[in-house]
């Protein structure tokens, strides 16, 4: 069925041009299945909602800085059978994000901590949450740079806005001033306001030795 010459510009004017992608297909379905006008309109609007949802998800994932291949589906649980798969499936529901709770992933290098951290963040993005993935060292360098040009507060906001912040590779090396203070301020500001996923090759009991000045 040929589209009306007026229909295309009207849909674009209403920012509904995505409907054009499935309009002809839906027209054929409507004729074959004898849909009512209301059913036909509902299918078109469902298509538009789905398209917009996928577009928004793609934007959230891009802004989060996540590797699209790091998902729970691509993680090799057989490689490290000590990982509690059921617990990760539960975390993938993202209830911890809704409750502003935190997740710590510890283990030796090469055990998949970063992969799992990104996978959980992707699941959160799929549920409508904003995420940001960044190595701890890179974050601290960025905050430190803000002390030189008086942009520290603005830079800190970058890490307070996301619903879930993934801090990768904490503990690779000791922290020197002002890094401990910056990290403390960040965690303190996010406490009960947003979630953190922290990956580390050191157990929490070892963390105090990373700080030159205990907090």
Show which residues each predicted segment covers:
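Conserved P-loop
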Residues: 83-161, 208-211
């Amino acid at each position: 069925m040929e589209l009306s010459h007026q229909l295309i510009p009207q849909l674009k004017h209403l920012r509904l041009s995505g409907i054009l992608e499935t309009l002809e297909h839906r027209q054929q379905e409507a004729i074959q299945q004898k849909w009512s006008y209301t059913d036909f309109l509902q299918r078109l609007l469902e298509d538009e909602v789905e398209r917009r949802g996928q577009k928004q998800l793609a934007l959230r994932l891009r802004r989060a800085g996540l590797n699209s291949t790091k998902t729970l589906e691509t993680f090799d649980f057989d490689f490290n059978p000590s990982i509690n798969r059921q617990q990760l499936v539960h975390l993938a529901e993202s209830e911890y994000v809704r409750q502003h709770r935190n997740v710590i992933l510890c283990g030796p290098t090469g055990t998949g901590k970063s992969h799992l951290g990104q996978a959980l963040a992707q699941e959160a993005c799929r549920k409508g949450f904003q995420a940001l993935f960044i190595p701890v060292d890179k974050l601290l360098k960025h905050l430190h740079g803000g002390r030189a040009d008086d942009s520290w507060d603005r830079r800190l906001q970058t890490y307070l806005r996301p619903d879930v912040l993934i801090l990768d590779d904490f503990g690779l090396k000791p922290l020197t001033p002002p890094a401990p203070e910056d990290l403390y301020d960040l965690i303190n500001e996010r406490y009960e306001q947003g979630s953190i996923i922290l990956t580390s090759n050191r157990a929490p009991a070892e963390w105090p030795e990373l700080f030159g000045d205990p907090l």
